[in-house]
Amino acid sequence: MRTLVVLGDSTSVGIGDPVRGGWRGFGPLLGESFADYRNFSFAGARIGCLRTKQLPSALAARPDAVVVLAGMNDTLRSDFDPSTLHQDLDHVVGALRDIGAAVVTVRFHDHSRVFRLPGTLRRALSDRIAELNAVVDAVVARHGIGCVDLDRLPGAYDLETWSVDRLHPSELGHRRLAAAFAGVLGTPAVSQECVGGVRITPLHHAAWLLVKGVPWLWRRGRDLFPLVVRIMRDARVAEPIRSDRSLPTGLLSDVVEQTAGDR
């Protein structure tokens, strides 16, 4: 295979694996086995962006192999719609297969375990990820493409796999991703030896969570709030009838504690 193309969001951009002048990430690591490597990803991209903004460039490149990694941004938005995601992802993969490209994508891990969200918000995000994975499974089955299950990636839930923000892979995490993609595509193995950057300690993670993590949680939590309310409502309906009809405010307390600092 000669040409590799990467489509996706900030993880595909390489954020979390800094090098002089920018980011590296799994793309260039995997791309070392190809004569030509092109990355059309950009931070904040959703699956719809791949269809409208990245796919045309990918098709023009006539790639032999394509990595498609996006969807997590969709799970964090209030307009999350699995039906639309399926249409967009199916279109992207179908168009790439039509030109003969080998395509590999991912099933997502439960990222709420990495970020350690409070209970009800964790459930909301986990439910969204499960719906996203159902979309991925359907597209993978229809087109017969490769798929890496991030939940089974070695060290998927180890802090060393993640950058200080816990949102993007660290250098080691990107190397693990690249190795998994190489295994599916049948290209040479990717070294797992980290050669740059600063080792991230639990103190780094704690400091980031305090300064930036809580504001991020508040912003994203607002988009997830309708789903949180629905989960609380469903849990309430499932409870045995009690004389005390007060709202289960205790279910919200863990969210409030995590978000109050951003006001």
Where are these regions (language model features)?
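Oxyanion-hole/transition-state-stabilizing segment in secreted/luminal serine hydrolases
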Residues: V13-D17, G48-H86, D110-H111
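Alpha-helix N-cap and loop-to-helix initiation/capping positions
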Residues: G21-G22, F80-Q87, T120-E131, D165-L172
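A short helix->loop->beta-strand "cap" motif at the edges of active sites that frequently abuts
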Residues: D98-V103, I145
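Alpha-helical scaffolding segments of alpha/beta enzyme cores, especially the outer helices
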Residues: T84-Q87, H91-D98, E131-A138
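Serine-esterase "nucleophile elbow" of acetyl-processing enzymes
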Residues: M1-A43, K53-R62, G250-L251, V255-D262
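Substrate-gating cap/lid alpha-helix
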Residues: R113-L150, E171
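Conserved catalytic region of serine esterases and O-acyltransferases that act on ester linkages
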Residues: R142, D165-R263
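Residue-level recognition of beta-strand->loop/alpha-helix junctions
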Residues: S41, R107, D149-R152
